Amino acid sequence: MNNSMINPSIVDLLKKVENRYTLVTMTAKRARQLIEGSEALVDIDSTKPVTIAIKEISDRAITYETVKEGIK
């Protein structure tokens, strides 16, 4: 097994959101919030904002709403 595999996998993450666009947008927006000082909503050893955001999505600690203008 390749040790560089991302956990959770993209396949698993896509089961929790509508599509890849939503996944990327959610991850980017949440990572930006974390960089700006928001507290992590999950327990994780990593300090990397993208890793934390992905874990939050995987654990369904954050939600999203699709609006006409995009993702909120």
Curated annotation (Swiss-Prot):
What the entry lists under InterPro entries is as follows: DNA-dir_RNA_pol_omega (IPR003716), Pol_omega/Rpo6/RPB6 (IPR006110), RPB6/omega-like_sf (IPR036161)
Provide the catalytic activity annotation: RNA(n) + a ribonucleoside 5'-triphosphate = RNA(n+1) + diphosphate
Record keyword Ion transport present: no
Instruction: Tell me which GO cellular component terms the UniProt record holds.
Output: DNA-directed RNA polymerase complex
GO biological-process terms attached to the record: DNA-templated transcription
Q: Which UniProt keywords apply?
A: DNA-directed RNA polymerase, Nucleotidyltransferase, Transcription, Transferase
Q: Which domain of life is it from?
A: Bacteria
Q: What is its EC number?
A: 2.7.7.6
KW Electron transport (keyword) present: no
* The protein's enzyme class: transferase
Q: What is this protein called?
A: DNA-directed RNA polymerase subunit omega
What organism is the protein native to?
A: Clostridium kluyveri (strain ATCC 8527 / DSM 555 / NBRC 12016 / NCIMB 10680 / K1)
Q: What is the lineage of its organism?
A: Bacteria, Bacillati, Bacillota, Clostridia, Eubacteriales
